[in-house]
Amino acid sequence: MRTAQVSRSTAETEISVSVNLDGSGTYDNQTGVGFFDHMLDQLSRHSLIDMTIRAKGDYHIDDHHTVEDTGIALGQALVQALGDKKGINRYGECHLPMDDAQVRAALDLSARPFLVWNVDLPTQKIGSFDTELVREFFQALATHGGITLHIDQIHGVNSHHIAEAAFKAVARALRTAVEVDPRKADAVPSTKGAL
């Protein structure tokens, strides 16, 4: 089983994450940040990665540390669950529409973290959620998951739709990238022999 559990405890947050890369997209995410939970649920459902996430943060300040630290812990869990990465597709991409929004995500599970973020969320808030935290989450996920991650907004006028399209596009790209190709199940997907 390609599974992992990660706990992260700081003066600002307490996070626990468990993932199953060979799951069916079941989820139980409770971070105390409603819109963020909704996005994490989409990430799980559309990647088919089972996720259970618990987070407690310094909400009296804002949601920044909770969102960022969840991205850190989830990235670390993905690295653990992937192990030596033998047999994985490694690459994934998705061009995803959601009403007015269209977002493209392309990623490489290369152990070379990098985020390209070409997304313009037109409002500062989605409900009470700070829209700048969408990028913060993906930056933390890419950095600590060793992911080269490109997210590009093609269209969109509604912040909720754009953000949700981004999470779903990344989810679909992850789904492809973590899948094992039986034709190369014992090989690392690199001519270097390691990732």
Curated annotation (Swiss-Prot):
Top EC class, one word? lyase
Keyword tags: Amino-acid biosynthesis, Cytoplasm, Histidine biosynthesis, Lyase
Single annotated GO MF = imidazoleglycerol-phosphate dehydratase activity
Any one cellular-component term (Gene Ontology): cytoplasm
Q: In which pathway does it act?
A: Amino-acid biosynthesis; L-histidine biosynthesis; L-histidine from 5-phospho-alpha-D-ribose 1-diphosphate: step 6/9
> Is Amino-acid biosynthesis among this UniProt entry's keywords?
yes
Please name the PROSITE patterns in this protein's record.
Answer: IGP_DEHYDRATASE_1, IGP_DEHYDRATASE_2
Which Pfam family is one of this chain's hits?
A: IGPD
Classification via InterPro entries: IGPD_sf, ImidazoleglycerolP_deHydtase, ImidazoleglycerP_deHydtase_CS, Ribosomal_Su5_D2-typ_SF
Q: Which GO terms describe its biological process?
A: L-histidine biosynthetic process
Q: HAMAP family per the record?
A: HisB
Q: Which family does it belong to?
A: Belongs to the imidazoleglycerol-phosphate dehydratase family.
Protein name, per record: Imidazoleglycerol-phosphate dehydratase
